[in-house]
């Protein structure tokens, strides 16, 4: 039994992969030590996507055509998961993401699964928390380069607006380095809180 693991072992978001990779390796070692599944041992094929969507697609295609994996664990981040989820569905290869929260990763796909909550769940919960804290206005600072950030921002904005909060929106991209002008704009509108739905 071959299981492919597609994850960012290196790059900007590699810290998210450590727990996933080590967790998979630990469980596979445990299963194999107990005799495998129906007497068959599990072989892991682990590849580094570097957190890049196109690299994840290339790895997925190789794992299916050359490595002949039976299951994919990954991707870790939403953008790369979105890039391979449709491929998994078409190939009818089960894919499980431990941490991709974008709703569209699994939507309408019966071969794609997640073991975590979704962007709407997080965004709504955060907006409700802002209401509980009795904030009247919140600035949302969104990284438009990230599917994760955009999904969370939209869910937060929808719920916070329903709850009567005033929303101030500012956007940036992953390449931005100077936030002085954006933060000056936000400061000028005097929000009671700032919501930054992004990777740390």
Where are the predicted features?
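Loop/turn elements at helix/coil->beta-strand transitions in domains of secreted/extracellular proteins
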Residues: 1, 39-43, 66-71, 90-94, ...
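An alpha-beta-alpha
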Residues: 112-174, 193
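Beta-alpha junction/loop-to-helix N-cap segments that form part of ligand/metal-binding clefts
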Residues: 15-22, 34-106, 115, 174-179, ...
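Short, intrinsically disordered, charge-balanced linker/junction segments flanking boundaries
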Residues: 192-200
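Second-shell loop/turn segments in exported
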Residues: 9-15, 46-49, 69-71, 110-116, ...
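Short, well-ordered amphipathic alpha-helical segments that serve as non-catalytic structural scaffolds
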Residues: 23-31
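Amphipathic, non-transmembrane alpha-helical secondary structure
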Residues: 25, 54-65, 82, 124-132, ...
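Short beta-strand segments enriched in small/hydrophobic residues
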Residues: 1-19, 75-76, 137-143
